[in-house]
């Protein structure tokens, strides 16, 4: 039986409600949110990365590699026919194939690369992110031999799971099986990552998913569900997916539609999103009002994202339009005689190009205020080592001078995950270069009381109805950024211009903009800490009063 709808691989990691809206005929003319510029740039970067990989493969394999034509004037049906002919001819390597539609299974789509094994084809995905980490155990093969039978256990790499990649590969595997072109035996599939030096191989039949499931089993369950959701929408049946707020909502083109509906119904996911919202609805709590009516100290059900009592208080805060409430009457914030606020700026996974600092407190023979340690060589580059070494040397000197004067010292960041990653990563990448500290020294610092994560304190001391991000919390403390477009996603675009990444001359105005943005970030954590330590904090609503 032919399926009424054919879905691509993206649906299995997409919100169920979005799948419904994309296939509901009545929603075709509804206004959607404009494309996110940062998201569009990531897509463009990924396209360029795939082009670089295809060029490398063309140099390696010459006439053995066939590229399926692609463009706005080329119909998908024509691309599918060319791909089918190439597979029937046994072409060793097929770039950009549009796989035959699985009309019975309801599948459509393509993959970046097909490689011919002795008994059939194997799908390979090309992505612009890391597919492995330092370690051992990953099965890899060199780019010059991108076949699973050439894979060996890599002594220097361990697999970075990347569930989305595995699900996309599972979709292609099912298409190949339906068309009769899949390699016989165990389902293996490969990924070429950001470094593009090896193929990392995934066993799609290995029980590596939660509960001992395989990637194929996980994919099959998700795809079956999304196919049912899309089919019901296309037929005009009762929807199988209702709006519910999740993390991805903020970048979804359908958010304006769902936002209106969620607020109209005062849906409980406006306060407790994701799995917690599902659990609450099952327990009969569907609205923010119903959640606010629950009794503190008598949890109805256990929640995953937060304690039940916190959810109740957040619901009451939401009804009063309160952004932040404090958990306790007295608040403790670690302070010191000499304080440094630190903020790191990175460009995706490629490198950390700036370490900004705000020095305040007692005199240590250093000018108080802002300083930045930056490189304007496009990352990754060896000049990162210089800027990181200068930052670490300066920070260490301030600590030592404070100690010599009998003064206490603390450095602060907001959400240490990013800073810690690049502190340790930079020490590891550049070890042995001038001024680079040993990894053990960096690890000792980040584990010490001298390194304070303000995000962790905010999480412990406040309940936040609209998120805990610095851009949300600092304005409550009275701080504002000078740039109305300040934000991590926008800074990615500014950085591209600042270093001339797209072939244009480096833009000095964007460099100044990034420096100002970074300065405001460290000033924001400084202002937030001062506010949390002041008497003004008592003016903030107290959770106990709600």
Which residues fall in each region the model found?
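C-terminal extensions
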Residues: 258-272, 276-392
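Acidic, Mg2+-coordinating catalytic module of metal-dependent nucleases/exonucleases
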Residues: 165, 171-175, 185-265, 473-546
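Flexible loop/turn segments at secondary-structure boundaries
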Residues: 2-3, 19, 131-132, 258-259, ...
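Generic beta-strand/beta-sheet core signal
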Residues: 294, 342, 360, 412-415, ...
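Conserved DEDDh/DEDDy metal-dependent 3′-5′ exonuclease domain
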Residues: 92-104, 108-134, 142-227, 372-490
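Generic amphipathic alpha-helical segments used as scaffolds and interaction surfaces in large
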Residues: 40, 44, 159-163, 236-239, ...
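Metal-dependent nuclease catalytic cores that hydrolyze phosphodiester bonds in DNA/RNA
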Residues: 1-119
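Short linear loop/turn motifs
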Residues: 72-77, 293-297, 307-308, 484-498
């Amino acid at each position: 039986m032919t399926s009424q709808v054919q879905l691509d691989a993206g649906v299995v990691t997409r919100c169920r409600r979005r799948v419904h809206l994309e296939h509901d005929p009545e929603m075709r003319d509804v206004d959607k949110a404009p494309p996110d510029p940062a998201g569009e740039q990531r897509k463009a970067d990924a396209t360029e990365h795939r082009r670089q990989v295809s060029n490398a493969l063309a140099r390696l394999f010459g006439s053995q590699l066939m590229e399926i034509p692609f463009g706005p004037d080329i119909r998908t049906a024509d691309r599918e026919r060319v791909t089918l002919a190439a597979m029937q001819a046994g072409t060793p390597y097929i770039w950009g194939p549009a796989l035959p539609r699985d009309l019975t299974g309801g599948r459509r789509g393509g993959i970046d690369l097909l490689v011919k094994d002795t008994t059939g084809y194997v799908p390979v995905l090309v992505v612009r992110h890391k597919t492995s980490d330092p370690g051992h155990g990953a099965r890899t093969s060199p780019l010059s031999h991108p076949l699973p039978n050439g894979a060996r256990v890599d002594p220097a790499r361990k697999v970075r799971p990347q569930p989305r990649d595995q699900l996309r590969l599972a979709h292609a595997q099912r298409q190949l099986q339906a068309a009769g072109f899949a390699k016989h035996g165990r389902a293996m599939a490969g990924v070429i990552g950001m470094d593009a030096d090896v193929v990392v191989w995934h066993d799609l039949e290995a029980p590596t998913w939660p509960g001992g499931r395989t990637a194929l089993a996980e994919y099959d369950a998700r795809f079956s569900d999304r196919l049912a959701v899309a089919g019901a929408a296309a037929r005009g049946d009762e929807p199988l997916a209702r709006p519910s707020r999740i993390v991805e909502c903020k970048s979804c083109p359908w958010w304006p539609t769902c936002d209106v509906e969620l607020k109209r119904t005062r849906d409980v996911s406006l306060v407790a999103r994701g799995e917690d919202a599902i659990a609450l609805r099952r327990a009969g709590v569907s609205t923010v009002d119903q959640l606010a009516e629950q009794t503190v100290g008598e949890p109805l059900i256990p929640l995953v994202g937060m304690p039940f009592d916190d959810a109740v208080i957040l619901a009451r805060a939401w009804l009063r339009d309160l952004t932040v409430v404090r958990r306790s009457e007295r608040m403790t914030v670690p302070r010191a005689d000499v304080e440094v606020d630190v903020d790191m700026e990175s460009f995706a996974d490629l490198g950390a190009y700036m370490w900004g600092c705000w020095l305040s407190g007692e005199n240590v023979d250093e000018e108080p205020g802002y300083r930045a340690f930056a490189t304007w060589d496009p990352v990754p580059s060896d000049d990162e080592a210089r800027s990181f070494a200068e930052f670490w040397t300066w920070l260490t000197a301030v600590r030592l001078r404070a100690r010599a004067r009998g003064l206490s010292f603390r450095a602060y960041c907001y959400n240490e995950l990013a800073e810690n990653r690049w502190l340790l990563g930079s020490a590891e990448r550049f070890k042995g270069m001038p001024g680079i500290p040993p990894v053990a020294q960096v690890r000792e610092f980040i584990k010490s009381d001298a390194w304070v994560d303000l995000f962790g304190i905010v999480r412990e001391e406040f309940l936040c109805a609209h998120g805990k991000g610095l851009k949300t919390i600092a304005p409550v403390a009275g701080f504002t950024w000078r740039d109305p477009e300040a934000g991590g996603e926008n800074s990615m675009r500014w950085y591209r211009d600042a270093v001339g990444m797209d072939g244009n001359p480096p833009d000095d105005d964007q460099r100044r903009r990034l420096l100002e943005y970074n300065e405001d970030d460290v000033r924001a954590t400084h202002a937030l800490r001062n506010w949390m330590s002041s008497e003004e904090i008592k003016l903030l609503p107290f959770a106990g009063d709600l």
